[in-house]
Design a protein with these regions (language model features):
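Mid-to-C-terminal secondary-structure elements
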Residues: 12-192
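Membrane-interface junction motifs in transport/secretion proteins
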Residues: 1-7, 29
């Protein structure tokens, strides 16, 4: 559910559903979502020869709870947290290697996207969140109020017991109809 509302009562009711095993606050959107920002990185620390085509990077919101929800492993550095700034970034290992670094070497390095210089504070293990036949996308994770559009697009992420999706979907649709105003948007994405 997306929209301007107090999510607390809805989250409480979702947690009460017998098929639900975990619920997160509405701070993120699904990693398989099409609601991703794309950054274009064209310079980084140690780049000797300018590149002709910027490296596209899918950007997501992500603090430690997000990574734990998706069971994404931190290979080097630290998680983003409430003290992190918009200039701090966690990248995946494929992006670190594309830039010529091991995960450990990437920590503290700087990458540049037009007018923003990011400091790499963490590197996470690659994970497939697209088709397994496609290469793993270069991915970055950020926090901060400057990510306003991404924050406003956030929804409630949850996990449910295997084999209960149809029952879960029906229960969520019923909650949406009884607990949400028509201005709110219901999007149900199922990840396997």
């Amino acid at each position: 559910v997306m929209g301007d509302m107090d999510y607390t009562p809805l989250i409480r009711k979702i947690k009460e559903l017998p098929m639900i095993t975990e619920v997160m606050q509405p701070d993120y959107y699904p990693i398989v979502s099409q609601l991703t920002a794309i950054g274009q990185f064209d310079n980084w620390e140690g780049l000797d020869i300018p590149i002709d085509t910027p490296v596209p990077v899918k950007l997501f919101l992500g603090k430690e709870d997000f990574f734990r929800f998706y069971d994404i492993t931190l290979l080097a550095g630290e998680w983003l947290d409430d003290l992190s700034t918009y200039e701090d970034i966690i990248i995946n290992e494929s992006l670190a290697r594309r830039m010529g670094w091991s995960p450990q070497e990437a920590i503290g390095k700087h990458i540049i996207q037009s007018y923003i210089t990011y400091t790499i504070v963490g590197v996470v293990k690659d994970c497939h969140y697209g088709a397994p036949t496609l290469p793993i996308p270069h991915t970055g994770f950020l926090v901060g109020e400057q990510m306003g559009l991404m924050q406003r697009s956030a929804g409630i992420l949850f996990k449910y017991k295997e084999g209960t999706w149809n029952e879960c979907r029906k229960a969520l649709e019923h909650l949406y109809q009884t607990e949400c105003s028509p201005e709110n948007i219901l999007r149900l994405n199922s990840e396997h």
